[in-house]
Regions:
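Membrane-interface helix/helix-cap signal primarily in integral membrane proteins
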Residues: 2-182, 531-536, 545, 591-608, ...
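Hydrophobic alpha-helical transmembrane segments in multi-pass membrane proteins
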Residues: 114, 168-358, 423-490, 582, ...
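Non-globular, low-confidence helical/coil segments that flank catalytic cores
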Residues: 55, 67-86, 97, 103-110, ...
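Feature for secretory/organellar precursors and membrane-associated catalytic proteins
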Residues: 34-37, 278, 502
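Hydrophobic alpha-helical segments of integral membrane proteins
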Residues: 129-148, 155-156, 163, 171, ...
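Aromatic-rich juxtamembrane segments at the membrane interface
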Residues: 107-239, 244, 498, 548, ...
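Short hydrophobic/aromatic residue motifs in ordered secondary structure
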Residues: 44, 92, 190-193, 231, ...
Length: 762
């Protein structure tokens, strides 16, 4: 276990910063720049061999990432720099399904981020080769955008240079949702095209194996350094060098052996790659071709590549009768099925859904990808001679990307284009791959038995039938795995309410027995909370449709995430109904939200005091009930906090209260209207502000536990000390997203369980 956990432990500097979590600490550091990346608003400078001073303490940090402003000192790779700034640790995933920033950077050996206030170059010595490659990449990117425009130029830059800083976000999402997102990342497909293309070209010019191999390898190594040396590109580079080495030494190249050596080399360098999406997808794709390709080839009655056996004469004769198009289609389908079925586990684990048409879409897009890449490379070099010559060639690549857009849009219009299964647990993944391994074992056992039989015996037809069964079993196993994963998120025995960590804002997801509900969704300190925190959480929990989204009031920290969800329904989470307070309490923000909802096909409703939404769990038995307690019609309340929609959730003996931002005036009216009960759990109003959770309100509701949603080190000082004291005096246990991340309450109507994503059971 220590091998796989190597590098995951906090560095000494990170431990020092964690002594005051959430705070930015003033530091001074000296180190050598080894990499520079241009981002949207800042420049990321990667520094190695650093000495970091924090107060009176000094730490040696092998690698750091520093954000500097574009207008600050011009730094080059190899420079030794002295930087003053504020240091912080990377965020962990604070909701299920969210991006774990810390894990991502720790895999690269980086534990701390510094925001630079001042930068001083103390040595102008440069790494000439790396600096040249960095400048080449930057100028190449600028040329592509200048020739093709921001949209297609950014796409070509991502494909050729691995630079996604200008990649259109909607295009990236469109490709990912349709299962062709791998085309936008530098992968084995790209590296193989470039590496083998250069190698073959050099061989055709008359160079020998050794000369062509050395030259091709040197060019591909330089290219890998230029694009940032990601996991998939390193895998492709290692396998290319092994391939060329085999040619140079006159040996046969074995794909499986090459794959194993590449995996061993990368895992030895960084054991945490074993948990990296890029590593698993890159190696898994090749492993699928090696391991499952022969199984599906037998199922479709074609050749059995990778078995090391020759086809018999009758099979060769049969293949000659097939048209070239049919053979191409069968080969593409076999490859696509092999890759997708072996990668099903990582796809569900990291992306939570399966694009159902991706098998067929990849048959169309992969064969023409070399056209786009070839046009991009050739057009770039021709542009150096004359833009008038290079531009038409580059536009061939632009036309390919335009075609991809149209294919993805067409696929998105087809019914049932994606199946949201949620994030599978470890048990399901282990079971799936054990069954896959057993089916492959059965196939290879049967294949070897068949090869020992006399091919002229009548039993050969029986063998062909038997050899088709493992492939059918693999497809059935993949379907069952996907369906079982989704069904595993259904609450057969109870309901669940989760207070998401959206920073300084509010968002609560309720999963009933049959339907899904959301109460608010927004943040004032987390940008793109809808697409970065709320939607990934929902998809990871197998929620592709929200039946009711309740909006308590129109403040940005309660609705801006919902606005994102409404706009992105086509590729994200569908919203059936938007529920708002009575019309008289609407402000301009709520009216705009209603317009946005109706524009995107969502029905807008109002909920008055006394209205309720109830589920039935069979035989007329009432299940979850959400009842509106306020505001009542005709009350003298201003639109906003004090007129927040207040909801009472009941399920069996369980009671939970959601209060929006009501504060003292709204709480006073609730106490007077006589609808309040005693509650097991209170979702504290207004992030625990001073004016909320008054003594009278707590005396009436008598909550056993209070859940507070507030941002870490927020500027408002929420939750306020006075509020916490009142809650404690009322005998209430207090839990906050600041410490625990997502807070999840599960109940069967009697038993209640509470846990946080960053903490154990509470």
């Amino acid at each position: 276990m220590s091998f796989f956990g190597a590098g995951e432990e906090p560095s000494a500097l990170e431990m020092a910063l964690l002594e005051d979590p959430g705070a930015d600490v003033e530091v001074a550091l000296e180190g050598t720049v080894y990499r520079i990346e241009e981002k949207a608003k800042v420049t990321a400078v990667y520094v190695k061999d650093s000495t970091v001073s924090v107060s009176s303490r000094k730490f040696n940090e092998s690698k750091l990432m520093v954000y500097i402003r574009p207008d600050q000192t011009k730094i080059k790779i190899g420079n030794k720099v002295k930087i003053y700034g504020e240091a912080s640790v990377f965020d962990r995933a604070r909701n299920p399904g969210n991006f774990d920033q810390r894990t991502y950077y720790v895999r690269q050996g980086i534990h701390v981020l510094v925001w630079a206030e001042s930068v001083k170059i103390i040595s102008r010595e440069t790494d000439a080769a790396r600096q040249f490659l960095a400048e080449l990449r930057s100028e190449w990117r600028g040329m592509l955008i200048g020739q093709l425009g921001e949209y297609y130029g950014g796409t070509m830059s991502a494909v050729l240079l691995g630079d996604k800083s200008s990649l259109d976000g909607e295009m990236k999402k469109l490709y990912q949702k349709n299962g062709i997102g791998h085309l936008l990342a530098i992968s084995g497909l790209h590296m193989s095209f470039i590496g083998m293309g250069i190698y073959s070209l050099l061989r055709r010019t008359g160079l020998g194996f050794i000369s062509a191999g050395v030259a091709g390898g040197a060019i591909l190594i330089a290219y890998t350094v230029m694009i940032g040396a990601g996991v998939s590109s390193l895998r492709a580079l290692i396998m290319f060098l092994i391939r060329v080495g085999a040619d140079m030494t006159g040996r046969d190249y074995d794909l499986a052996t090459s794959l194993a050596l590449a995996a061993a080399a990368l895992v030895w360098q960084q054991p945490l790659y074993m948990t990296d999406a890029g590593f698993l997808l890159s190696f898994g794709a090749i492993l699928g071709l090696v391991l499952l390709g022969p199984v599906f080839a037998a199922m479709f009655g074609t050749a059995c590549p990778g078995t090391g056996r020759k086809k018999n004469k009758s099979r060769r004769a049969g293949n000659k009768k097939c048209g070239a198009a049919a053979r191409w289609l069968a080969g593409g389908l076999i490859s696509s099925l092999s890759v997708n079925i072996l990668l099903l586990g990582p796809i569900l684990y990291f992306y939570f859904e399966v694009p159902l048409y991706s098998v067929f879409l990849n048959l169309l897009v992969i064969p023409i990808m070399p056209v786009a890449m070839g046009a991009g490379i050739a057009g770039s070099f021709l542009t150096l001679i004359s833009p008038a010559i290079g531009s038409p060639v580059l536009k061939i690549g632009k036309a390919v990307f335009w075609l991809y857009d149209q294919l993805c849009s067409a696929a998105g219009m087809l019914p049932a284009g994606r199946y949201v299964a949620g994030k599978p647990c470890a048990g399901w993944l282990i079971t799936y791959y054990v069954i896959l391994g057993c089916l492959c074992g059965v196939f290879y056992f049967l294949y070897r038995r068949k090869e020992k039989d006399d091919p002229e015996l009548p039993s050969k037809d029986r063998w062909n039938i038997l050899l088709r069964l493992p492939g059918c079993g693999l497809m059935l196993c993949a379907v069952l795995m996907t369906v079982a994963c989704r069904r595993g998120y259904r609450n057969a025995e109870g309901i669940q309410a989760a207070v998401l960590d959206v920073g300084q804002g509010d968002c609560i997801h309720i999963r009933g027995r049959e339907e899904n509900y959301l109460i608010d969704g927004g943040s004032s300190d987390v940008s793109s909370a809808g697409s970065c925190r709320i939607e990934p959480y929902l998809l990871a929990n197998a929620v592709d449709t929200l039946d009711y989204v309740f909006v308590t009031h129109g403040d940005e920290d309660h609705i801006n995430g919902i606005q994102e969800l409404l706009k992105g329904q086509e590729l994200g989470v569908r919203i059936r109904n938007l529920v708002l307070p009575p019309q008289e309490y609407h402000d301009e923000k709520l009216e705009e939200l209603i317009y946005l909802a109706q524009k995107n096909g969502t029905r807008a409703l109002v909920m008055n005091a006394g209205d309720e939404i109830a589920e039935e769990i069979g035989h007329g038995t009432e299940g979850l009930v959400l009842k509106c307690l306020g505001p009542e019609d005709g009350q003298e309340l201003k639109p906003g906090n004090e007129a927040s929609l207040v909801l009472d959730l009941s399920y069996g003996e369980f009671r939970m209260l959601f209060t929006g931002d009501v504060e003292s005036r709204g709480e006073e009216l609730l106490c007077k209207n006589g609808r309040l009960e005693q509650y097991d759990v209170l979702k504290a109003a207004h992030h625990g502000s001073r004016g909320s959770s008054t003594e009278e309100f707590l005396r009436v509701t008598q909550p056993a536990a209070a859940l507070i949603s507030a941002g870490v080190d927020n500027r408002y000082g929420h939750p306020h000390e006075e509020t916490l004291e009142r809650l404690e005096a009322a005998g209430c246990r207090i839990y906050s997203t600041q410490q625990s991340g997502t807070l999840t309450v599960w109940t069967d109507g009697e038993i209640i369980r509470l846990k946080g994503i960053l903490t154990s059971d509470l």
